[in-house]
């Protein structure tokens, strides 16, 4: 009897182990813990865009055609006037602006200068700038940006930009032929701007009351962050105001705030799984879906519609001695063709791999698939939100 009992126990243990392995295999994967700095950002700690208008000089004959871009010569005249040089001497007949309008400059280009002022930037810090042609310059390669003030949205000057440009493209032309690689009408200057004014510290003005803004609104993730912060710093440190904003009680002293924020940003939180969503790009035909998308059983019939337009020139020749003129006309033939589409069964998909397999079985192009997905959503077979960008 004892060997029989032992065998039964071993069999029961094996069945229990197999059941546990099956449960683990089919259980949904737990969300991976992420750092808080990857899930949210501190309100007020952000970049600030800067913009300015300036001139690039030293171009090898590839600058603006000044007869077509009068603002280039006007800007150059204003800059020279600020340097004490006047070019509007005029003539005896009173042509006060003839010198400016007759300037044929090929080595100058009007440009827009943009930069990003990082948070907590101090005067004297160097930042990168991007220089983009505003007129019809062929290339900015080899040019030098003259001193350009960069302003913020409030109209204040926050940085001054100047320096030699680095253009990633290259091009050559001869006898009407032209070869170009990459973009020649824009370039960058590494460290080309010096910060002259700092943005007021928004964190220091909050008197120890900070707010976290989640990158993606989710009530579950917000609650998990509150629980993690309160477990690490004590009860009452964090309070969720809504699904995106969390209020924090931080030390009022700036030195303690740095240590508090450094510890806070490295907290690991497991975010909630994202809502099922399908992104459709109507311009490029791209379709992206996340892992939460599922399908229900449905039948799909989709026929391709094609339009073919064939245009041929037709010459109408007048008779001899008729004083007529030869006329060239266009003769067009238009064909409209629609392929027959039969119903196809699309099986249900419980995960992303099954959904991809089911959609690929239709054999539709991305453009057709966009219409099919919208119809599936309307029929209730697609369990996801559709977003067209």
Curated annotation (Swiss-Prot):
Single GO MF descriptor: structural molecule activity
Statement: the UniProt record of this protein carries the keyword Membrane: no
Entry-linked InterPro entries: Flag_FlgI
Pfam families with a match to the protein in the record: FlgI
Keyword tags: Bacterial flagellum, Periplasm, Signal
UniProt-listed PANTHER family: FLAGELLAR P-RING PERIPLASMIC PROTEIN FLGI (PTHR30381), FLAGELLAR P-RING PROTEIN (PTHR30381:SF0)
UniProt keyword Glycoprotein, yes or no: no
The protein's assembly and partners: The basal body constitutes a major portion of the flagellar organelle and consists of four rings (L,P,S, and M) mounted on a central rod.
Transmembrane segments: none
Organism encoding this protein: Burkholderia pseudomallei (strain K96243)
First and last residue of the signal peptide: 1-33
Family named by the database record: Belongs to the FlgI family.
Its biological purpose: Assembles around the rod to form the L-ring and probably protects the motor/basal body from shearing forces during rotation.
Cellular localization per UniProt: Periplasm; Bacterial flagellum basal body
Protein name: Flagellar P-ring protein
Biological processes annotated in GO: bacterial-type flagellum-dependent cell motility
